[in-house]
Amino acid sequence: MYKRQVLALVSTPSYDNNDFIRGMSSEKWNALNEDENKPMYNRFRQVWCPGSTFKPIIAAIGLTTGAIDPNEDYGNEGLSWQKDSSWGSYHVTTLHAYEPVILKNALIYSDNIYFAKAALKIGENDMESSLTKLGFNDVLPFDIKMAKSQFSNTEKIEKEIQLADSGYGQGQILVNPLHMACIY
């Protein structure tokens, strides 16, 4: 059994490594470098928008900070919600209406609205400090250099909508896949 070992890092689309050993024509080299799918780009080293994979992290932060009561019913808002008119035309949307709107069901239905509300309850200070404790904005201690995960382009959550979007893994949240695996 393997513990705490990275057995493989995968980036797709890929190319045949043997082409480098056998010698590659300039045409093949140019084709690889000009391919719009960028097979030479190491995606596992980059950061990506985590989307719904981030919701359990928000749940853990909310429970740890006491901002979320797992049995509190947030009420069914339908498929679109905004905190108030200060958000202008911006709405958070979700795919499923269900009841009761509690943490367990929000995870089952992957409810963006619930997690946007949860992020607002957590607040920017607790969100920033919790994500910093989880290694955001830090270099991963790994033999291969990885891009740093971030919760904001400026290292600060500056707007309420940004905080709400962070609750469901959107906004300016970017996470390295290896970092996400380590957090889980």
Residue ranges of model-derived segments:
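Beta-lactam-recognizing serine transpeptidase/beta-lactamase-like catalytic domain environment
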Residues: 3-52, 57-184
